[in-house]
Design a protein with these regions (language model features):
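Charged phosphate-binding loop/patch that engages nucleotide di/tri-phosphates or the phosphate backbone
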Residues: 120-151
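Short secondary-structure junctions
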Residues: 59-66
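Conserved Nudix-box catalytic region and its N-terminal flanking loop in Nudix hydrolases
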Residues: 18-58
Length: 151
């Protein structure tokens, strides 16, 4: 079986806090509409980190910082074996413009399972979830439960 070697960016709001991750819905092929971490194939002569920076620039018009390896997925699809290195990343510059995907969302630890993931990406969600922090509530004041008054 042919092996395809790729990289994926687990883009988070902050590599320290990791409260939200960015996922995209595939816009083409047999798995159209299923969700994945953005990335792509490693070209000859590239390191995984170089490939990831290039792919995110091409797919999302965004510059990223590549952090630590989250893990490597080894997954057998019907037509090929996928070997995918997943890295923590964060945005340095750019607006995450969708050039290939049909949709995108920022997902929290609590709603990471709210989208239909590609089978390979599904296998690393527990590792990602365990590294994420919960989103802090917006209401932190002692006055949060008091009714609003007109000025």
């Amino acid at each position: 079986m042919k092996t395809i070697r790729v990289v994926a960016a687990v883009i988070c709001d902050s590599m320290q806090a990791k409260r939200k991750i960015y996922a995209t819905a595939r816009g083409y092929g047999d798995y159209k509409g299923q969700w994945e971490f953005p990335g792509g194939k490693i070209e000859p002569g590239e390191t995984p980190q170089q490939a990831l920076k290039r792919e995110i620039e091409e797919e999302l018009d965004t510059e990223i910082a590549v952090g630590n390896l989250v893990g490597t997925i080894e997954y057998d699809y019907p037509a090929f074996h996928l070997s995918m290195d997943c890295f923590w990343c964060e945005v340095i510059s750019g607006d995450l413009v969708l050039k290939e995907a049909e949709a995108a969302r920022w997902l929290t630890k609590d709603d990471i399972d709210s989208v239909p993931w590609l089978p390979a990406d599904q296998t690393i969600l527990d590792v990602i979830r365990s590294s994420m922090q919960p989103v802090k509530p917006l209401h932190t004041s002692e006055y949060d439960n008091e009714p609003l008054q007109r000025c």
